[in-house]
Amino acid sequence: MAVYKQSLFVFSTLLVAGLAVAAPQIALSAETSVEVNPQNNSNLDALLRQGREFVDLGDYSKAIAIYQEAARLDTENPRIFSGIGYLEARQGNYQASVEFYQQAIGLEPNNADFQYALGYAMANLQNYPAAATAYRRATELDRKNVNARIGLGVVLFQQKDYSGAFKAYQEAIALDPKSWQAYSSMGLVLIQQGNFASAVTVLQQAAELAPKQASVQLKLGTALLRGGNTSEGLAAFEEAAKLEPRNPEVQLEIGELLQAQNDLDGALVAYQRAIAVRPNLVGAHAGIGEIQLEKQDFLGAITTFRRVIELDRNRAEAYYNMGKALKASDRKSEAIEAFQQALDTYRQQGNNDGAQKAEAALRELK
């Protein structure tokens, strides 16, 4: 790997590539133990049991269909809606997950688990302001919720509110001094602020708490490299790869870290390794497309972002980046179409910053 250049550190994809925020573990057992109102259809209890059976079998699509039928019979049961939201999130359908969690919250607004899960889904849609609002509400409702504070720190980091993120991680550590996730995330804030020595100290604490976590070694390696300690930094990266040699997420994060440091060739190799293990890993394809854009390989970028969109039609940034590649290729009408799709998707997800960016791109072409 090339020696890292001093450039802006861009954080890796939320909740996917090594970021230590727990997915919402909303207990699905609640759906199978719901008291059935005698006034409701007598089929409700059977539907709930059947839905649970499909969950146990891992057939989430059928489980969702069954729970939706149950929800039509019992429109006042927030647990059914939260269960559907959970299953949609498990399948990566975060927009649908948001809608069902919002229905659950409408019925039970003071449920901290629902608020946390809504924040998780919003974060995956890259709607960071909405995610922050939900995570804050979760911390207000459950003052001992460590994961909500870590999640809040993550989305504040994405909004460049580094002091707010640091404070959220401090609060998480105060609640749980053994939270390696909080130390790991705090290390990223310190890296962003250029305080590499402190970042190394914090990340070494995370490594002591979680010696088998490859993601911690990746971040530690970044801090060491950017602090000028090349040999130890590369050793940390090698340790990460050794801990999880077949984990495409590790290669994905290595790619993102290298890309953030402008080592585009090294990043490309890491992304390709990730795809070799998991061909449909969206983040790796998106990273390759961004590198192709940077290298002005516009035809390659167009092809790659089309693949990204095939894999995830709700990825607004892919439409936007494809629009940039089409514009650079003098394919104006196609670029307008891509930017318009980006705008529509950003708006649908409530991402105002993204929508403004897409609107500006459209104005330049019209």
Regions found by a protein language model. Give the residues of each.
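Terminal, low-structured helical/coil segments at or just beyond the last alpha-helical repeat
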Residues: 2, 7-10, 31-45, 279, ...
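Helix-start (N-cap) detector for alpha-helical repeat units in TPR-like alpha-solenoids
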Residues: 44, 78-79, 112-113, 146-147, ...
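N-terminal leader/linker segments that initiate helical-solenoid repeat arrays
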Residues: 2-83, 89-92, 99, 363-366
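Structural signature of tandem alpha-helical TPR/SEL1-like repeats
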Residues: 58-65, 90-103, 125-137, 159-171, ...
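Surface-exposed, polar helix/loop patches in the mature regions of secreted/periplasmic/lumenal proteins
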Residues: 99-151
